Regions:
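Short, structured surface patches at the beginning of a domain
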Residues: 1-107
Length: 107
C-alpha cells in the first residue's frame, strides 16, 4: 500500500478569508499533480495549531502559501513552524517565490 506522502498531498494555508487566493493556489496544486488535504484560513488562534498537526503527522509533502507571513506576523512563530517542517522533510512553498521552498535564516 502506498503511504500518504507518496500521493503528493499538500496543505494550503492562507491569511484571512482570501478565497480568491486560496482558489489560485489550489489550481496550482492540482496542475502540479498534488492532492489538497485541506485549505486552512488563518482567521483564528487554532490555525497554526492545525498546520502543526499536519506537519507532525507527515501526511503532506508541502505547505503552499502566498507568502510565509501568511503563517504569522510573529517572526519567532514563522521560524518555529518552518523549523518543524524542515525536521519532517516538509517544504513550505511560497507563491511569491514562484512556489520555490521558502528559506529560513538562523541569524
Amino acid at each position: 500500500m502506498q503511504d500518504s506522502r507518496e500521493k503528493k498531498q499538500c496543505l494550503i494555508f492562507v491569511r484571512n478569508n482570501a478565497n480568491d487566493r486560496a482558489d489560485r493556489i489550489e489550481a496550482y496544486a492540482k496542475k502540479s499533480g498534488m492532492k489538497v488535504v485541506e485549505t486552512i484560513f488563518n482567521t483564528d488562534k487554532k490555525a497554526v495549531e492545525r498546520l502543526r498537526y499536519y506537519i507532525e503527522r507527515d501526511v503532506i509533502i508541502c505547505v503552499l502559501v502566498r507568502d510565509v507571513v501568511d503563517i504569522s506576523m510573529e517572526l519567532n512563530e514563522i521560524k518555529a513552524v518552518m523549523t518543524l517542517a524542515a525536521e519532517h522533510g516538509i517544504s513550505i512553498n511560497a507563491e511569491s517565490r514562484g512556489y520555490e521552498p521558502a528559506l529560513i535564516s538562523y541569524e
